[in-house]
C-alpha cells in the first residue's frame, strides 16, 4: 500500500499544503507504532482507531478519504450502528473539543459537520429493514436547537429496529410539533433531541406536550 493510500484511509495523519500531502515526523512515528498494515487479524481491525482516522479526514475536508475510513470499518466487521456510535460520534466529540480548546476554528468544525452529514446520507439506506414496520416514531428538536446530526442518527437507529421514523429536524415550533403528533396518531414513540443548553426548557415543553397527546403508555424520550 502506498503512503498516499494510508493518508486517504485516515491511518496516517497528514495536511495538504499547495497540492502536496505533508506528514509530520510525530505522525509517522505514531503510525509505525500502530502498524497500519492490512495483515492484522479481524479483532485488531475491529478495534483499530477508526474514529481518530475519521476525524483526521474530516478536518482535512477529505470527503473521499472519510468515506474510505467508513468503508474500511464496515469491512472490518463493524455494523452501521457501530459506525455511528463508535466511529462518527467520537470523531465529532474530538473535533468539538478541539474547537472549544481553540485548536481549530469554527470553519473547520462546520466543514467536518457538513462532511458527516454526507456520510449519514450514504449510510442511511443500510438501516432500512425489510418487512412490516412496528409503528411510527416522531423525531424532532425544539426551537433554538440547531444540531441535526444526532436526530438523524437516532432516526436511523429506530429504522434499524423496524420502526418508521418521521424526522422533523431541529428548531421545531411547539405548536407545529403538537399538530404533527396529532396527525400521526397512534404513535409508538416520540424522541426529542437537544444538545443546546439554551433549548432545554423548550425541549421540556415538547416532552410535556407529547405526553399529553400520546398518553401515558407511549415512550417519550
Where are these regions (language model features)?
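Long amphipathic alpha-helical segments
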Residues: 2, 9-129
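Compositionally biased, intrinsically disordered low-complexity regions enriched in proline and serine
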Residues: 5-7, 164
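C-terminal regulatory/effector modules of DNA-binding transcriptional regulators
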Residues: 102, 118-221
Amino acid at each position: 500500500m502506498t503512503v498516499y493510500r494510508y493518508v486517504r484511509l485516515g491511518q496516517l495523519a497528514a495536511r495538504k499544503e499547495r497540492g502536496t500531502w505533508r506528514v509530520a515526523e510525530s505522525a509517522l512515528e505514531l503510525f509505525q507504532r500502530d502498524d497500519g498494515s492490512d495483515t492484522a487479524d479481524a479483532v485488531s481491525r475491529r478495534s483499530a482507531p477508526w474514529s481518530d482516522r475519521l476525524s483526521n479526514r474530516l478536518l482535512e475536508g477529505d470527503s473521499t478519504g472519510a468515506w474510505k475510513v467508513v468503508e474500511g470499518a464496515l469491512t472490518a466487521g463493524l455494523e452501521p450502528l457501530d459506525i455511528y456510535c463508535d466511529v462518527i460520534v467520537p470523531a465529532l466529540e474530538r473535533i468539538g473539543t478541539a474547537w472549544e480548546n481553540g485548536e481549530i476554528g469554527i470553519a473547520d468544525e462546520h466543514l467536518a459537520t457538513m462532511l458527516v452529514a454526507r456520510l449519514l446520507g450514504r449510510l442511511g439506506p443500510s438501516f432500512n429493514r425489510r418487512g412490516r414496520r412496528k409503528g411510527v416514531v416522531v423525531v424532532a428538536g425544539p426551537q433554538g436547537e440547531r444540531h441535526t446530526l444526532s436526530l438523524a442518527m437516532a432516526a436511523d437507529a429506530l429504522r434499524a429496529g423496524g420502526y418508521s421514523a418521521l424526522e422533523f429536524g431541529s428548531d421545531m415550533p411547539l405548536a407545529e410539533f403538537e399538530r404533527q403528533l396529532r396527525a400521526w396518531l397512534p404513535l409508538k414513540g416520540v424522541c426529542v433531541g437537544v444538545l443546546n443548553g439554551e433549548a432545554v426548557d423548550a425541549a421540556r415543553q415538547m416532552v410535556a406536550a407529547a405526553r399529553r397527546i400520546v398518553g401515558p403508555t407511549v415512550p417519550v424520550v
